[in-house]
Amino acid sequence: MVKNSFNSVIPQEENKGSVEFQVFNFTNKIRRLTSHLELHRKDYLSQRGLRGILGKRQRLLAYLSKKNRVRYQELIGQLDIREPKTREF
């Protein structure tokens, strides 16, 4: 599972406030909600919650990519997350 591969990214100390840990938790919640919504397609409240969690994770990933691009690339590689499309004006 993803949890085992993530242990190498974050040391064993208490890092519950780190961006990587928060993105990891949001990713686990997203995967659980996605599997739930495959069974319960009309659960609109869960769909709304999923969209909120996706937005929070997207904002955290944008912050991490601005602050430390190397850690960002490692994290999306470890968690198997697609890199979001960037808007160009």
UniProtKB/Swiss-Prot annotation:
Its main location: plastid. One of its GO terms (biological process) is translation. Keywords: Chloroplast, Plastid, Ribonucleoprotein, Ribosomal protein. SMART domains: Ribosomal_S15. SUPFAM superfamilies: S15/NS1 RNA-binding domain. It is found in: Plastid, Chloroplast. Part of the 30S ribosomal subunit. This is Small ribosomal subunit protein uS15c. It comes from Chloranthus spicatus. The lineage of its organism: Eukaryota, Viridiplantae, Streptophyta, Embryophyta, Tracheophyta.
